[in-house]
């Protein structure tokens, strides 16, 4: 059995144009087709171009094939429809041996980088309402993660509570805060959110490309070799830095039942991060005030859950990190997805690195089921909506 801890919906092109109040229509995020390559891109008036929505649904299809098919027919639909159609998704997942998946946004990631608090909150409510309807098709197998507005922390807490009532299973907040607005993770700004998430038993997440440090990364991607390579490092470094900040700030010391998922940043950094934060703690932090009563790696292993897609370096280092807080994901329907050969991909990696059956089960379904309280007796069988 496989359960993906990080997959994606691909929002309808006109979701926000149709659902936001008429007074916000001109500002509404939308999909726009580029006449030069016929790809659809997520755009917001007055902002840099966002994610390539065409390539966000092309699991199992090469970029070259996408280009050739669009050149022949610019209006062609290419790729999976499960990003916006829950019934198609359930069929695609079952065919791939995936019994359930945790759903993150595609276009919606960049909404967490908006500076206009009221406009952002309106956009996030639209997304969360749509996602809740999507997941209602099969709530045991489609586990939606809500987007949370954090400029006003009370608004963020209310939205997390609303998400819980809607049947969503967690909340996603900005991966890194704006550097110049007094919202560092070391401040008390977030305390109500940490407490609410722990009390509600709602895991929180940070995801690559959803923070203020990487605000323009997507727009720059592909423009130059420098920006393209930097994109690959910057998006994951942002997640790692925020993990360290949350640990050092004593967030998990104060809220031991809080769970935070580091999504799509991989696990190749995990052993190095553990060693470095413990070394720093042992050598330097004893010379100053610290809220921590345990080694930093204790909080990393007990409160931070890391997802990976295909990560040979990270899997080779499981002997250092353990496997109890690491979760496999297939990234469907994005171009980097293991779909439609997820079982083959997992089996190859496990064989190559000598991963035993119990560890494989932890990585591919036990850990995620434990974190999100997935009913395994239900999801073992095919969805009634197939």
Residue ranges with predicted function:
Residues 65-242, 246-249:
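Active-site gating/metal-coordination segments in enzymes
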Residues 3-5, 101-103, 143-146, 171-173, ...:
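Hydrophobic faces of well-ordered beta-strands that scaffold small-molecule active sites
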Residues 233-242, 247, 284-315:
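Aromatic-anchored helix/helix-loop segment that forms the rim or "lid"
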Residues 165-170, 198-203, 223-225, 255-258, ...:
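Glycine-enriched alpha-helix->loop->beta-strand junction motifs that scaffold or abut catalytic
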């Amino acid at each position: 059995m496989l359960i993906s801890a990080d997959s994606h919906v691909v929002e309808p092109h006109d979701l926000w144009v149709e659902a936001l109040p008429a007074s916000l229509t001109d500002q509404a995020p939308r999909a726009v087709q580029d006449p030069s390559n016929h790809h659809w891109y997520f755009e917001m008036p007055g902002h840099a171009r966002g994610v390539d929505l065409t390539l966000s649904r092309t699991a199992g299809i090469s970029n070259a094939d996408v280009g050739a098919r669009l050149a022949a027919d610019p209006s062609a639909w290419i790729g999976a429809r499960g990003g916006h159609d829950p019934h198609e998704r359930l069929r695609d997942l079952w065919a791939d041996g995936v019994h359930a998946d945790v759903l993150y946004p595609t276009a919606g990631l960049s909404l967490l980088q908006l500076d206009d608090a009221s406009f952002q909150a309106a956009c996030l409510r639209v997304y969360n309402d749509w996602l809740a309807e999507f997941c209602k098709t099969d709530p045991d197998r489609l586990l939606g993660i809500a987007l949370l507005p954090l400029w006003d922390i009370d608004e963020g807490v209310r939205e997390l509570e609303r998400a819980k009532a809607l049947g969503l299973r967690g909340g996603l907040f900005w991966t890194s805060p704006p550097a110049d607005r007094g919202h560092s993770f070391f401040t008390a700004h977030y305390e109500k959110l940490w407490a609410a998430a722990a009390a509600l038993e709602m895991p929180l997440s940070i995801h690559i490309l959803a923070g203020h440090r990487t605000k323009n990364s997507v727009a720059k991607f592909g423009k130059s070799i420098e920006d393209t390579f930097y994109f690959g490092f910057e998006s994951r470094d942002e997640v790692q830095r925020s993990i360290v900040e949350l640990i050092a700030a004593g967030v998990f010391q104060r809220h031991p039942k809080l769970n935070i998922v580091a999504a799509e940043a991989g696990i190749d950094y995990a052993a190095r991060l553990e060693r470095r934060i413990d070394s720093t703690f042992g050598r330097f932090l004893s010379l100053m005030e610290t809220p921590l009563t345990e080694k930093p790696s204790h909080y990393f292993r007990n409160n931070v859950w890391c997802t990976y897609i295909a990560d040979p370096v990270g899997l080779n280092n499981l002997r250092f990190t353990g496997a109890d807080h690491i979760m496999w994901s297939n990234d469907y329907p994005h171009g980097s997805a293991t779909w439609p050969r997820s079982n083959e991909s997992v089996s190859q990696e496990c064989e190559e690195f000598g991963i035993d059956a119990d560890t494989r089960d932890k990585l591919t379904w036990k850990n995620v089921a434990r974190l999100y309280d997935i009913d395994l007796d239900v999801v073992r069988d095919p969805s009634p909506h197939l």
